[in-house]
Amino acid sequence: MVNAVNVANVNSVPGLLDVPKINAVVTDNFRAKMVSNTDMIELAANKEAASFEQTILKAFDSMNAKQTNMDKLGEQMIVDPESVDVHDITMGMAEASLSLKLAQTIIDRLVKTWNDITTTR
């Protein structure tokens, strides 16, 4: 005979019968579901490419926005130090510095390439 005291009823345990169904992963329209805060991914995914000039101008506008945002955070830190987190200041300074160095490197490479092209002729 089965000891009725030690036998657990599987139907009475709430978590054992409620198994969630896993749906199949559909990747047909994966790019449409991507969310971006910049237009760069959208431009890269589109068939029509932006001109080189437009790409450079957008990059410089982004760099300028980061520099301006950092200036505003710096002013706010001086006026009301308790309203700004030090971590935000540090991250903003690093991001602005990196974007400025990247822009400087791109300009230097463009000037060097232009000089190489003009001296070869």
From Swiss-Prot:
It holds the Pfam family FliE. It is found in: Bacterial flagellum basal body. GO terms for biological process: bacterial-type flagellum-dependent cell motility. InterPro entries: FliE. It comes from the Bacteria. GO terms for molecular function: cytoskeletal motor activity; structural molecule activity. GO terms for cellular component: bacterial-type flagellum basal body. The keyword Glycoprotein does not apply. Keywords: Bacterial flagellum. NCBIfam families: fliE. Belongs to the FliE family. This is Flagellar hook-basal body complex protein FliE. It comes from Treponema denticola (strain ATCC 35405 / DSM 14222 / CIP 103919 / JCM 8153 / KCTC 15104). The lineage of its organism: Bacteria, Pseudomonadati, Spirochaetota, Spirochaetia, Spirochaetales. The gene is fliE.
